[in-house]
Amino acid sequence: MTIEGLGFITKCFAEMGIPYEFMEWTQGVSFPFFVGEYSEIESLNEDGLEEGTFILTGTTTGTYLELETVKETVKNYFGYEGITAILESGSGIAVSYGTSYPIPIDEQEVRRIQINLNVKEWRC
């Protein structure tokens, strides 16, 4: 996943009003907050296509429904069909909603959710 692609995803979360940082939360703790990472799929094509999954993990001390509300916002924004854009470099990107699930953890006061987005980037 390119830096430019990560920047596009960051802008999308900002438009949705989702408190987000990449890889680790570095701001003062206020709930809920969301941290993103990604996993790439090896490309066997020569057409410049790179595919991966963007993993958004949400944490709150509120209810699971609070996290589900954010999930619905993300799901409605990206949809299963996805959104597309041409980036400043001329590369293309498509981001769509994939899957999500609650993450059980041992801390009784903390709840988590994982939201997976499908990402495709085409380099020039």
What is the predicted role of each segment?
Residues 1-46, 81-91:
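Small/polar-rich, solvent-exposed N-terminal microdomains that initiate assembly or binding
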Residues 48-62, 111-121:
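Oligomerization/assembly interface segments of phage tail-like spikes and tubes
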